[in-house]
Protein backbone atom coordinates (compact mmCIF):
# COMPACT_ATOMS: atom_id res chain seq x y z
CA UNK A 1 0.00 0.00 0.00
CA UNK A 2 1.14 3.50 -0.80
CA UNK A 3 -0.02 6.69 0.86
CA UNK A 4 -2.50 8.47 -1.39
CA UNK A 5 -2.87 11.45 0.92
CA UNK A 6 -3.14 12.64 4.50
CA UNK A 7 -5.55 15.02 6.12
CA UNK A 8 -6.12 16.54 9.51
CA UNK A 9 -8.75 18.83 10.97
CA UNK A 10 -9.56 20.44 14.28
CA UNK A 11 -13.02 21.66 15.24
CA UNK A 12 -13.94 23.93 18.11
CA UNK A 13 -16.68 22.09 20.00
CA UNK A 14 -18.42 25.32 21.08
CA UNK A 15 -18.76 26.42 17.43
CA UNK A 16 -20.32 23.08 16.50
CA UNK A 17 -22.73 23.43 19.43
CA UNK A 18 -23.65 26.97 18.37
CA UNK A 19 -24.37 25.89 14.78
CA UNK A 20 -26.45 22.96 16.02
CA UNK A 21 -28.49 25.28 18.24
CA UNK A 22 -28.86 27.94 15.54
CA UNK A 23 -30.16 25.37 13.02
CA UNK A 24 -32.52 23.69 15.44
CA UNK A 25 -30.65 20.39 15.08
CA UNK A 26 -30.68 20.36 11.27
CA UNK A 27 -26.89 20.66 11.20
CA UNK A 28 -26.55 17.12 12.56
CA UNK A 29 -28.99 15.81 9.95
CA UNK A 30 -27.07 17.58 7.17
CA UNK A 31 -23.62 16.37 8.24
CA UNK A 32 -24.14 12.90 9.72
CA UNK A 33 -24.89 9.72 7.82
CA UNK A 34 -27.74 7.49 9.05
CA UNK A 35 -25.63 5.28 11.33
CA UNK A 36 -23.78 8.28 12.77
CA UNK A 37 -27.08 10.07 13.36
CA UNK A 38 -28.41 7.15 15.42
CA UNK A 39 -25.28 7.17 17.59
CA UNK A 40 -25.45 10.97 17.94
CA UNK A 41 -29.06 10.87 19.18
CA UNK A 42 -28.29 8.04 21.62
CA UNK A 43 -25.24 9.80 23.04
CA UNK A 44 -26.99 13.16 23.22
CA UNK A 45 -29.90 11.57 25.09
CA UNK A 46 -27.44 10.37 27.75
CA UNK A 47 -25.29 13.52 27.83
CA UNK A 48 -25.61 16.73 25.83
CA UNK A 49 -21.85 17.29 26.03
CA UNK A 50 -21.01 13.79 24.74
CA UNK A 51 -23.49 14.16 21.90
CA UNK A 52 -21.97 17.46 20.82
CA UNK A 53 -18.44 16.02 21.11
CA UNK A 54 -19.49 13.10 18.89
CA UNK A 55 -20.86 15.50 16.27
CA UNK A 56 -17.68 17.59 16.41
CA UNK A 57 -15.41 14.55 15.94
CA UNK A 58 -17.46 13.32 12.98
CA UNK A 59 -17.48 16.77 11.37
CA UNK A 60 -13.71 16.94 11.85
CA UNK A 61 -13.21 13.42 10.43
CA UNK A 62 -15.16 14.28 7.27
CA UNK A 63 -13.06 17.40 6.76
CA UNK A 64 -9.82 15.46 7.32
CA UNK A 65 -10.95 12.70 4.95
CA UNK A 66 -11.86 15.19 2.23
CA UNK A 67 -8.34 16.64 2.50
CA UNK A 68 -6.68 13.20 2.46
CA UNK A 69 -8.38 12.23 -0.80
CA UNK A 70 -7.63 15.62 -2.35
CA UNK A 71 -11.20 16.62 -3.16
CA UNK A 72 -12.16 18.90 -0.33
CA UNK A 73 -15.92 19.02 0.04
CA UNK A 74 -16.59 18.57 -3.67
CA UNK A 75 -18.53 15.83 -5.45
CA UNK A 76 -18.46 12.90 -4.94
CA UNK A 77 -17.33 13.79 -1.40
CA UNK A 78 -20.46 14.83 0.48
CA UNK A 79 -21.14 15.07 4.19
CA UNK A 80 -23.44 12.06 4.38
CA UNK A 81 -21.48 9.89 1.90
CA UNK A 82 -18.78 9.25 4.51
CA UNK A 83 -19.42 7.92 7.99
CA UNK A 84 -16.97 7.37 10.82
CA UNK A 85 -18.17 4.48 12.95
CA UNK A 86 -16.57 2.44 15.73
CA UNK A 87 -15.69 -1.23 16.04
CA UNK A 88 -16.79 -2.85 19.33
CA UNK A 89 -13.22 -2.23 20.56
CA UNK A 90 -13.78 1.51 20.06
CA UNK A 91 -11.45 1.77 17.07
CA UNK A 92 -12.89 4.20 14.51
CA UNK A 93 -13.23 3.30 10.84
CA UNK A 94 -14.72 4.97 7.79
CA UNK A 95 -17.53 3.72 5.57
CA UNK A 96 -18.23 5.38 2.23
CA UNK A 97 -21.46 5.03 0.29
CA UNK A 98 -22.89 5.87 -3.11
CA UNK A 99 -20.76 7.63 -5.68
CA UNK A 100 -18.01 8.30 -3.16
CA UNK A 101 -17.63 4.55 -2.55
CA UNK A 102 -17.45 4.00 -6.32
CA UNK A 103 -14.87 6.80 -6.73
CA UNK A 104 -12.69 5.33 -3.97
CA UNK A 105 -12.98 1.77 -5.31
CA UNK A 106 -11.98 2.88 -8.81
CA UNK A 107 -8.76 4.28 -7.34
CA UNK A 108 -8.13 1.46 -4.89
CA UNK A 109 -8.31 3.90 -1.98
CA UNK A 110 -8.87 2.83 1.61
CA UNK A 111 -8.45 5.00 4.68
CA UNK A 112 -7.50 4.91 8.32
CA UNK A 113 -8.96 7.46 10.71
CA UNK A 114 -8.40 8.52 14.27
CA UNK A 115 -10.48 11.01 16.23
CA UNK A 116 -10.08 12.57 19.64
CA UNK A 117 -11.84 15.22 21.65
CA UNK A 118 -11.34 17.25 24.76
CA UNK A 119 -13.62 19.82 26.31
CA UNK A 120 -12.90 22.54 23.73
CA UNK A 121 -11.69 20.76 20.59
CA UNK A 122 -12.19 17.71 18.41
CA UNK A 123 -9.37 16.58 16.15
CA UNK A 124 -9.11 14.00 13.39
CA UNK A 125 -6.34 12.53 11.29
CA UNK A 126 -6.84 10.46 8.14
CA UNK A 127 -4.35 8.49 6.08
CA UNK A 128 -5.71 7.49 2.67
CA UNK A 129 -3.91 4.55 1.10
CA UNK A 130 -4.02 3.05 -2.36
CA UNK A 131 -3.00 -0.24 -3.87
CA UNK A 132 -2.25 1.56 -7.14
CA UNK A 133 1.36 2.19 -8.11
CA UNK A 134 2.63 5.37 -6.46
CA UNK A 135 3.20 8.40 -8.63
CA UNK A 136 6.83 9.36 -9.21
CA UNK A 137 8.21 11.62 -6.53
CA UNK A 138 8.30 15.29 -7.37
CA UNK A 139 11.68 16.62 -8.34
CA UNK A 140 13.30 18.68 -5.61
CA UNK A 141 13.06 22.41 -6.04
CA UNK A 142 16.46 23.95 -6.59
CA UNK A 143 17.14 27.46 -5.49
CA UNK A 144 19.72 29.71 -6.95
CA UNK A 145 21.22 32.56 -5.10
CA UNK A 146 21.62 35.88 -6.82
Swiss-Prot record:
Residues annotated to bind Mg(2+): 9, 63
EC number(s) reported in the record: 2.7.8.7
InterPro entries: 4-PPantetheinyl_Trfase_dom, 4-PPantetheinyl_Trfase_dom_sf, ACPS, Ppantetheine-prot_Trfase_dom
Coiled-coil segments: none
Cellular component per GO, a single term: cytoplasm
NCBIfam families the UniProt entry points to: acpS, pantethn_trn
Official protein name in the record: Holo-[acyl-carrier-protein] synthase
Native organism: Burkholderia orbicola (strain MC0-3)
Protein's gene: acpS
Amino acid sequence: MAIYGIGTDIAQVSRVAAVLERTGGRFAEKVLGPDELRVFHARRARSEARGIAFLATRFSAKEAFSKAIGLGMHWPMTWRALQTLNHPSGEPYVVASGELADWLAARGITARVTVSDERDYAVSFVVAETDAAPAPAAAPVSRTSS
